[in-house]
């Protein structure tokens, strides 16, 4: 997996280490409720659902209808699936 080195920082390392400490779904809910706004959490979840649907071969139209994602978001996720660091796999 190739990660953009410009993203690497001590703050990001600390965030990811904290996430890796979470052991249950309830701990995840508590952590993300405190660290994200409701809209930020919804956006993250939506992008994961979009990625899943793109990998399954669903059309943009179906994805928009089922997730409410914009075509811009779908395109961004698709670009990450094709050219990204394999973070969605």
Residue ranges and their predicted role:
Residues 57-64, 86:
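Short helix-capping/linker segments at secondary-structure and domain boundaries
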Residues 26-46:
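Short, Lys/Arg-enriched anionic-surface-contact patches
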Residues 79-89:
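Short, solvent-exposed alpha-helical "recognition" segments
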Residues 62-67, 74:
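Short alpha-helical "recognition helix" segments of helix-turn-helix
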């Amino acid at each position: 997996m190739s990660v953009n080195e410009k993203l690497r920082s001590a703050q990001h390392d600390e965030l990811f280490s904290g996430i890796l400490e979470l052991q249950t779904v309830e701990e995840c809910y508590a952590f993300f409720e405190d660290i994200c706004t409701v809209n930020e959490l919804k956006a993250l979840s939506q992008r994961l659902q979009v990625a899943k649907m793109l990998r399954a071969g669903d059309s943009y139209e179906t994805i928009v209808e089922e997730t409410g994602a914009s075509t811009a978001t779908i395109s961004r996720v698709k670009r990450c699936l094709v050219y990204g660091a394999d973070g969605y796999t």
